[in-house]
Structures are given as structure tokens and as C-alpha cells.
Amino acid sequence: MPMRLPITRERIRTHFHYAWWQYVLLVCLAIFGWNLLYTTTRYRSPESLKVEWYCQGVVAPQAQDKLDALLEQLRLELFPDMEEVTFTSVAYDQTYGDMQLMVWSSAGQGDLYLLQREPFQNLASGGAMAQLTPYIESGALTTGDIDLTAGYVTDSETGKKYLMGVPTDSLTGLEAYGINPEGCVMGLLASGGNLDNTLKLMQWLIDNMR
């Protein structure tokens, strides 16, 4: 018969002294497993039921809260059929920024992009952004007296210039939400899953942020 040593306070203390890391590891694995389960099983709105606004730059948490509240209000008033209208600030890396934007656009991530002029031109020249002239000609988009010069992009394949963005210098109302509009251009991602509603959001910004 195997001998069983009595469990004493000293033995428990010794056990935890040498095996504490096992319990820490167990807790970490449990947290990781829970997060993984939540991430893989949580409901995600389909592309047709959400509008995603990607903006270059870092937005403070307080400004992010204001933007989230604004977009939720717009979702209820302008996009009643949408499940999500979201804002994501994008920290642009000078070395890999263009590559990162290209990966996102190729994957159809985001719908409305607001970027500094040079990154916007680089992204749009490869055809990632939708041409806006047809929307303006049909009356679906009105830009008023905004100077659209900086929104024209030379297509890398055809060599022709197309209007692919709306300069945001005059949309100074964005500053109240922590966004610096100077020197930026906003455009519609051509591969976005919700062009009509993204266009509606762009029009709202033009009408209400000047």
C-alpha cells in the first residue's frame, strides 16, 4: 500500500512556492481560450449591412467616443437598415503604410477612406477608389464650391486622370471630432460592400462639416 503523506500547511506552501507558474499558465490559457472562442464565434455584420469609415491619423479616446456617438445617431437617422456604422483611425507607417492600405483595400476592408493626399493618390492610382464623376453627373453627389483639383488621380494603367476623391480642407467641422482635415482627401473604396450608403455618409460630411 503506497504511503500517503499528510497534507500540511508547510507542504501546501512549498507546493505553491515551486509550482506557482503552473497556475499562472493555466489562468493565461483559460483567458486566451475564452478570447479565442469569443472572437471566432461572435456575430459579425455582413458587408451589406455596415459602413466602415477609415481615417488616417491617431484620434484621442475622447474624440473616438464622440465619433462613435455621432455615427450611431446617423445610423439610426440616415441608415436605419444598417447594423453598424463605424469609425477606425489608422496609424500610417511611413515605410509600410502604402502596402498596408493596399492589403486592406484588396480585402475590401473599409468603405470610406479619408487619407493624406499622397497616400490617397498612391492608393487610388491603382484603381482602389471609385470614380466620383458619374455620381456627380447623376446628382447623387453634390460638392458645392469645393475645389476638387486635389481629388483627381492619374490612373496607373490608362494614364488618364479621374476624379476619385473629395478634398477635405474645408470640412473644418471634423476638428471638433479630433480629425485634422487639412491636406486630406476622402474617397469611396471601389471594392466596398456598401457603395450607396457610403456615398450617403460622404454627402452628409460634405453638407454638415463645412
What name fits each language-model region?
Residues 45-117:
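Early extracytoplasmic/lumenal segment of secretory-pathway proteins
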Residues 179-194, 208:
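A bilobed periplasmic-binding-protein/Venus flytrap-type ligand-binding module shared by bacterial periplasmic
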Residues 167-177:
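Non-catalytic, usually N-terminal nucleic-acid engagement modules in DNA/RNA processing proteins
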Residues 193-204:
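Short amphipathic alpha-helical coupling segments at ligand-binding clamshell hinges
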Residues 26, 205-210:
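Periplasmic-binding protein-like
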Residues 96-157:
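Extracytoplasmic "Venus flytrap"/periplasmic binding protein-like
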Residues 17-40:
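Hydrophobic membrane-insertion alpha-helices, especially the h-region
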Residues 1-14:
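N-terminal Lys/Arg-rich, disordered targeting/topogenic segments
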